[in-house]
Amino acid sequence: MSKKVFIKTFGCQMNEYDSDKMSDVLHAAEGYEPTQNVDEADLILFNTCSVREKAQEKVFSDLGRVKHLKEKGVLIGVGGCVASQEGAAIIQRAPYVDVVFGPQTLHRLPDLLAKRARLNKPQVDISFPEIEKFDHLPPARVEGASAFVSIMEGCSKYCSYCVVPYTRGEEVSRPFDDVLVEVAGLADQGVKEVTLLGQNVNAYRGPMGDTAEIADFATLLEYVSDIPGIERIRYVTSHPNEFTQSLIDAYARLPKLVNHLHLPVQHGSDRILMAMKRGYTAMEYKSTIRKLRAIRPDLAMSSDFIVGFPGETEDDFNKMMKLIDDVGYDTSFSFIYSPRPGTPAAALHDDTPHEVKLRRLQHLQATIDDSVRAISASRLGTVQRILVEGASRKDPTELMGRTECNRVVNFKGQPRLIGQMVDITITQATQRSLRGEVLTRDVAVQA
């Protein structure tokens, strides 16, 4: 009987991708099969995120909940950014943990487990071997018509509030040809939509073959677009400072680039943006969006917002709200600022009461919600092309898929439509999802 691994993933799409790779590595090396039931696992892994407040405490809380499973010989590992940040301190606080590994050393997981068994003591490897891990990863096991592809690692921006450069290292781009080979391999397995991943994905600068030539992100997008079978291209997360004119122009040339962009602004006050060390102004950010919407008028935008950064005044907050009104976001991810240990912003004086921060956050989220509802309502009666992902979460007898703009659409349809692109007439709209009916021609094609 095969061994089973349970992986709990926290945080961003990069972590989701890394968790998939952990599963692939363990399957190729040791025959592990994934399980969603922690009680039947032989190996339990926590792929952690250190971006939010009290991330470490959440990890130790989860570890405490599975500690009793050690009695039947279960192995426990901690990976991801908290592992990179805390290292051996995790073992000191939770000595029942068997392995601790960082985002750049997940490919060494089978070796770490073997060494743990051989030496009978916990193993820690949180080094930064740059892009080495991609040379040791087995081919991806595809599930569904969508897939993530990591094209670069790390971040060199050093925003004053962010731990990512310290936990994932500096920016390193994968070789251009390696990315194309991976995408082509996914297309051969039936993948129709790829999401290119990186902490600052549009900062990609990949070496091209044996030449000294470097491919920028726009060039990579063009080549990915030419791969047969790939019908949609997404990417996250992009940085406003890396949004070059060539990338903007790509939206005119490449119809496979979806009509959705996640471009985190974080704030709308130039004073706060400077304190965050973001490197752009609110006007420069909006200028980029104006250029994009001149090419794609219906481009759906999403963003990240931090409320209550140290020193934020009511005027600063109002400037953020004006930016939100000016742009019109399809969705957003918004949080109250929480200091991350070791970052420059953690040393800043913060005298804004929590109640004020909470009020501002609630106001921001209510404003975004109003925008989302209005945009959803505007979709009524339109025809949206969706990629069918599988059974609906609301009703397992129905199907769900996503529009180019990343809106969920639920509809009645045959299971044979899963993995296909179909046109849907939108008949109902709620804040978070749409409902529709399959056009007759798509039903006939699949009959």
From Swiss-Prot:
Q: Where in the cell is it found?
A: Cytoplasm
The chain positions of domain Radical SAM core read 141-374
Which residues does the UniProt record annotate as the domain MTTase N-terminal? 3-118
Q: Name one GO cellular component term.
A: cytosol
Q: Which reaction does it catalyse?
A: N(6)-dimethylallyladenosine(37) in tRNA + (sulfur carrier)-SH + AH2 + 2 S-adenosyl-L-methionine = 2-methylsulfanyl-N(6)-dimethylallyladenosine(37) in tRNA + (sulfur carrier)-H + 5'-deoxyadenosine + L-methionine + A + S-adenosyl-L-homocysteine + 2 H(+)
- What Enzyme Commission number does this protein have? 2.8.4.3
Q: Where do the TRAM domain residues begin and end?
A: 377-440
Binding positions ([4Fe-4S] cluster 2): C155, C159, C162
Q: Which UniProt keywords apply?
A: 4Fe-4S, Cytoplasm, Iron, Iron-sulfur, Metal-binding, S-adenosyl-L-methionine, Transferase, tRNA processing
Stored PROSITE patterns: MTTASE_N, MTTASE_RADICAL, RADICAL_SAM, TRAM
Kindly list the positions annotated as binding [4Fe-4S] cluster 1: C12, C49, C81
Which note does the record give on the cofactor?
Answer: Binds 2 [4Fe-4S] clusters. One cluster is coordinated with 3 cysteines and an exchangeable S-adenosyl-L-methionine.
Q: Which GO terms describe its molecular function?
A: 4 iron, 4 sulfur cluster binding; metal ion binding; N6-isopentenyladenosine methylthiotransferase activity
For activity, the cofactor(s) needed are:
[4Fe-4S] cluster
PANTHER family documented for this protein? CDK5 REGULATORY SUBUNIT-ASSOCIATED PROTEIN 1, MITOCHONDRIAL TRNA METHYLTHIOTRANSFERASE CDK5RAP1
Q: How does it assemble?
A: Monomer.
UniProt lists the family membership as follows: Belongs to the methylthiotransferase family. MiaB subfamily.
Function, in words: Catalyzes the methylthiolation of N6-(dimethylallyl)adenosine (i(6)A), leading to the formation of 2-methylthio-N6-(dimethylallyl)adenosine (ms(2)i(6)A) at position 37 in tRNAs that read codons beginning with uridine.
Query: What's the name of the protein?
Result: tRNA-2-methylthio-N(6)-dimethylallyladenosine synthase
